[in-house]
Structure formats: structure tokens, C-alpha cells
Amino acid sequence: MMTYEYILVRYGEMTTKGKNRSKFVSTLKDNVKFKLKKFPNIKIDATHDRMYIQLNGEDHEAVSERLKDVFGIHKFNLAMKVPSELEDIKKGALAAFLQVKGDVKTFKITVHRSYKHFPMRTMELLPEIGGHILENTEDITVDVHNPDVNVRVEIRSGYSYIMCDERMGAGGLPVGVGGKVMVLLSGGIDSPVAAYLTMKRGVSVEAVHFHSPPFTSERAKQKVIDLAQELTKYCKRVTLHLVPFTEVQKTINKEIPSSYSMTVMRRMMMRITERIAEERNALAITTGESLGQVASQTLDSMHTINEVTNYPIIRPLITMDKLEIIKIAEEIGTYDISIRPYEDCCTVFTPASPATKPKREKANRFEAKYDFTPLIDEAVANKETMVLQTVEVVAEEEKFEELF
């Protein structure tokens, strides 16, 4: 029985790139190799237009499951490779068709003759290949407009690829081509989705989480670690910075009027994150803010909070409503972690009536009454940093270490 020997990867948005396209292709190849570390027999060949993954006996379903989370891949096809002879092509097309799962009633044949010296033209090949499938199946018909299965045949010099099973990739651009940002990872539903969407644009992320023991628990801290771990499905690794925020929050609660405490808290977070971004050579800050969702996410609040940093603030969720955000969170695997009932620092000392239209002038006047600089320095100096990698990669490294 013939089996899938290759996976053909299509780039999608990367095809619009010009002179730097080779950088995008190289980064994608590197990301795919990292993602498929568990499969030692595969070989990867990345050309200008697509990528060829030779399976060499590896499980195509297991490989496909990992490929679907790699940004930069538009679609990929499971493919069989056969000699460019009519009978081999017909047999390969039938074998590929028979491996398609589900309720299949209709099909069509698509032929692309890259090898123009092949003795038969496309219009001659279509009935030959389609007829062979019809002769060897039951209750199957041809539908050229809306088929259940499109049997694609690419004819080249010496060999041809046969493809039926087409799957969607994650889209976007390869993580690593767009620089690095610091993402504020709160532990809620929104910020992991913001991190995911930022990575989808080819940007590497490092996460900053503010925790305030004893007001926030170790379980709340572990929840954020688990969220960062879940995000490693979409990149090589996530560096997480855990910032002690207790003294800053206690001082804000004591020195700042309650209506402005939330605004000042967010401004302090931005100042600390900017300091870490400078240390880590990040170029922007990403947040999970959605316009109008809570008091700190009005335009007035954002205008006042933005004042304290010169870094660009990326807000991927800014126009989304909560249901749209939840839908993505469920799809990427972060929702169930985010709804664990452990409070983060944003719920500590929550004011009864936070200002929804805070002014920069007032925020500056309130902050000027107390020197927060030593507290900011202390928070940055005492941060805990950990590097999280895909679970499979960690397991492989531990297995390797056990050998010595």
C-alpha cells in the first residue's frame, strides 16, 4: 500500500516579500526544524516558493499536528511521490484518494505540468486519471465546481507529486523576522491571546508578569507559568519575567487617591516593563487591552498611561469584543488555564470608583508627591526570569542528559 512520503508546505503571505524573502524562508525552515525535533528521520528542503518535508517513515499525522501551529505556513499537503509515468500517476492518484477520511462522494482532478516535455497534455491527463479512480471506486462522481476532494497532480521531470489531503496552517509570518516585544501577561483571558496574535506577525515575545505576594498566591503565579508554557506551542521558547510588585502596590494604595490608583498602577507597570525591554533589546510593549472593556481601557486611560513610555504600545485586541477574544483563547488552548480562579495583582486594592477619564496632569501631580524610583529599581532588580520551551523539546533534553 502506498503511503504519504512528503509534506509540501505553501508559504502564503511570505510570497509578497521581495529582496528579504530568503530571510523569511530561512527563519521558517529553522522554526519548522525546531518544531519537528522529535522526528529524527525527516529532511527539510526550503525553496523560494515552498518547503518540502521528506518523512522517511515518520508518522505523517504526528508531523502534521505540529506543523499546524507554525506561523508562516499558509497551507500544507500530504503528498505521494511517484515516477512521471502515466500508470504510476494513475495508481498514485487512486491510492491518495482512498486515504482521504470522511464521507467522500465527489472529486475532481487538477494537473499542473511543470515538466512541459511530458508526452500528454493536461486535458488528456484529466480523463485518464479521473477514469482510473471511477473504475476502482463505488458511488463516487466527478464534480469540477465543488468537489469533496481535489486530487492534485504536479508533474515534474522524472517524478510527480500526488496530493489530496490539504490542511490549513497557522498563517502569518515566521516568528523571529519582526524583532522582539515584551508582553504584559496578567493571567487573564486577554493577554495570552494578545501574545499569540503578536507572534502571528512574526514577532518574538518575552512575557512580564507582576505578582504581589502574599496578596496573590503561588497558584496564581503557576497559572501564568502554565500560560507561558502553552504559548510555546507557537514559537521556540518564551522567556517569562516574574516581577515582585507588592511594595509598589502598597505604596500606591497609601499615597495615591483611590480613583487614580489603577491608572498609576498601570503607569508603574509600563515604567518597569520599559526598563526590562531596554535590558532585553525589545522594541515594543504588547498588552491585552480591549477598548472600553474596563475602566483602565478607555481612550482617556490609555492616553494617560502611555505618557510614561516612549516605546510603541501594541494592542492586538483593541477592537475585539469579549466573545471574539474568548473564541481565539479556546482555539489556542489558553482559555481553560486563564479561567482558573486565582486572582492576579490587578485585583489587589481594587478601587470602588476608578477614574474612567484620568488626566495626565493629575496623574503626574499625584506621582510627584512620592519618589517611586527606588521601588521601580527594586522591582526590576528582584525579578525572577525563566525560559520555557515546548514540552517535547524539554523531554528530549532531559532524556539526553540522563545518558551522561
From Swiss-Prot:
GO cellular component, as recorded: cytosol
Pathway entry: Cofactor biosynthesis; thiamine diphosphate biosynthesis
Pfam families according to UniProt: ThiI, ThiI_fer, THUMP
Subcellular compartments: Cytoplasm
PROSITE patterns given in the database record: THUMP
Domain THUMP positions: 61-166
EC number: 2.8.1.4
Main EC class the enzyme belongs to: transferase
Residues given in the record as ATP binding sites: 184-185, 209-210, 266, 288, 297
Disulfide bond entries: none
Keywords of the record: ATP-binding, Cytoplasm, Nucleotide-binding, RNA-binding, Thiamine biosynthesis, Transferase, tRNA-binding
Alphabetized GO MF terms: ATP binding; CCA tRNA nucleotidyltransferase activity; tRNA binding; tRNA-uracil-4 sulfurtransferase activity
Alphabetized CDD domains for the sequence: PPase_ThiI, THUMP_ThiI
HAMAP family: ThiI
Role this protein plays: Catalyzes the ATP-dependent transfer of a sulfur to tRNA to produce 4-thiouridine in position 8 of tRNAs, which functions as a near-UV photosensor. Also catalyzes the transfer of sulfur to the sulfur carrier protein ThiS, forming ThiS-thiocarboxylate. This is a step in the synthesis of thiazole, in the thiamine biosynthesis pathway. The sulfur is donated as persulfide by IscS.
NCBIfam families linked to this entry: tRNA uracil 4-sulfurtransferase ThiI
PANTHER family linked: TRNA SULFURTRANSFERASE (PTHR43209:SF1)
Family the UniProt entry places it in: Belongs to the ThiI family.
Protein name: Probable tRNA sulfurtransferase
Lineage: Bacteria, Bacillati, Bacillota, Bacilli, Bacillales
Gene name as annotated: thiI
